């Protein structure tokens, strides 16, 4: 029994050593594989990630990406439809829309905007984004303002 445990320990040590040696190459290969698979126009055009990809300004990408991710539950065609509607409401200019406060009249009421997300909830998100973009200028700066905790924890503290 003890001999079997020693064999297992040697095997685990060997595998761990091999993983460390190959880690850099395997991570690179992993990232390249998925970049090739997902970072191409064929995939992007049929995925909700297409919305932030439409923009060039960092703030527009952040806002579009955040809101699209927030709505990304359910069937992909329905997500695309909701994200498309949201993009149209923002007149394809997320930062200007957030700063304009037009969302106060566009997103009020308890009726659903998408599935279980009410217009009021969308209004809360826009209110939160407005605070970030008026105080920090971009979400990245807001997250970097406090270095404590993970990015998700910092994002939650901003809420």
Q: What is each stretch, according to the model?
A:
Residues 1-159:
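HhH-family (HhH-GPD) DNA N-glycosylase catalytic core used in base-excision repair
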């Amino acid at each position: 029994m003890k001999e079997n445990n020693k064999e297992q320990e040697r095997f685990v040590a060997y595998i761990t050593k091999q993983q460390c040696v190959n880690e850099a190459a395997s991570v690179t290969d992993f990232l390249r594989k998925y970049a090739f698979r997902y970072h191409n126009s064929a995939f992007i055009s049929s995925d909700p990630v297409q919305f932030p990809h439409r923009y060039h300004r960092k703030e527009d990408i952040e806002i579009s990406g955040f809101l699209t991710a927030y709505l990304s539950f359910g069937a992909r065609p329905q997500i695309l439809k909701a994200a498309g509607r949201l993009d149209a409401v923002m007149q394809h200019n997320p930062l200007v829309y957030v700063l304009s406060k037009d969302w106060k009249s566009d997103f009020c009421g308890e009726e659903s905007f998408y599935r279980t997300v009410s217009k009021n909830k969308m209004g809360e998100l826009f209110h939160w984004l407005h605070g970030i973009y008026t105080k920090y200028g971009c979400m990245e700066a807001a997250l970097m303002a406090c270095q404590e905790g993970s990015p998700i924890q910092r994002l939650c503290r901003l809420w």
